[in-house]
């Protein structure tokens, strides 16, 4: 490949189709819109999803599910992250300080990873495996 044999990609230099510029251009009179009908009119744009009067797909399909307004979101922390802290007592304040949870978050501890040594963990929720692993290491899982 040299500068002397570089070429523009196909259709890169093609001119834009100009419609409505006389019969000789082949795109005069109806300007590629055909005769009559909604699409031939000026300012004609069907709304998104319009299917020619047929019931559109988004209205044919049934609505499903709902949003539970009482759902409680938890900040999830795994045991391996708690082990990295190397503390004997872990509270929500400690997790907020180490940026593992937000100020207003409720905390759920999950059992991914191993914890070494007796650790007291205070959180709003624990998974079964997390509770078992903390107890096995000689620690305590306290629910707030």
Curated annotation (Swiss-Prot):
It comes from the Bacteria. SUPFAM superfamilies: Ribosomal proteins L15p and L18e (SSF52080). GO terms for biological process: translation. PROSITE patterns: RIBOSOMAL_L15. Residues 1-58 are annotated as: Disordered. Residues 40-49 have a biased composition (Low complexity). The keyword Ligase does not apply. Binds to the 23S rRNA. Belongs to the universal ribosomal protein uL15 family. This is Large ribosomal subunit protein uL15. It comes from Koribacter versatilis (strain Ellin345). The gene is rplO.
């Amino acid at each position: 490949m040299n500068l002397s044999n570089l070429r523009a990609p196909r259709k890169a230099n093609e001119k834009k189709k100009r419609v409505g510029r006389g019969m000789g251009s082949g795109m005069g009179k109806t300007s590629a819109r055909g005769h009559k009908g909604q699409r031939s009119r000026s300012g004609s744009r069907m709304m998104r999803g319009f299917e020619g009067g047929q019931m559109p797909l988004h209205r044919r399909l049934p609505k499903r599910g709902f949003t539970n307004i009482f759902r409680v979101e938890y900040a999830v922390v795994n045991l391996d992250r708690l082990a990295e802290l190397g503390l004997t007592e872990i509270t929500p304040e400690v997790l907020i300080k180490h940026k593992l949870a937000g100020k207003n978050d409720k905390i759920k501890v999950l059992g991914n990873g191993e914890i070494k040594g007796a650790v007291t963990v205070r959180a709003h929720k624990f998974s079964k495996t997390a509770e078992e692993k903390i107890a096995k290491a000689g620690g305590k899982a306290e629910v707030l």
